[in-house]
């Protein structure tokens, strides 16, 4: 590998909307995410919808679908 062409890695802090904080290495020092392994339905076993713009409600109304 060539020297001097790769970006410098820094300690990065990743914050989820649920409040979970992760630390890793990245070229950015701070990132936010809406969903992570602590709050994602696949990992938690719970069924819930994460909706930030009302898309799920519009879809449910359009197809007469009930949200649980």
UniProtKB/Swiss-Prot annotation:
Membrane-crossing segments per the record: none
InterPro entries for this protein: Ribosomal_bL28/bL31-like_sf, Ribosomal_bL31, Ribosomal_bL31_A, Ribosomal_bL31_sf
Pfam families: Ribosomal_L31 (PF01197)
Entry-linked SUPFAM superfamilies: L28p-like
Cofactor: how bound: Binds 1 zinc ion per subunit.
Molecular function per GO: metal ion binding; rRNA binding; structural constituent of ribosome
Binding annotation for Zn(2+): 16, 18, 36, 39
Cofactor: Zn(2+)
GO cellular component, one term: ribosome
Keywords: Metal-binding, Ribonucleoprotein, Ribosomal protein, RNA-binding, rRNA-binding, Zinc
GO terms (BP aspect): translation
Ribonucleoprotein found in the keyword field: yes
Role, per record: Binds the 23S rRNA.
Subunit structure: Part of the 50S ribosomal subunit.
Family as reported in the entry's similarity comment: Belongs to the bacterial ribosomal protein bL31 family. Type A subfamily.
UniProt name for this protein: Large ribosomal subunit protein bL31
Organism: Dictyoglomus thermophilum (strain ATCC 35947 / DSM 3960 / H-6-12)
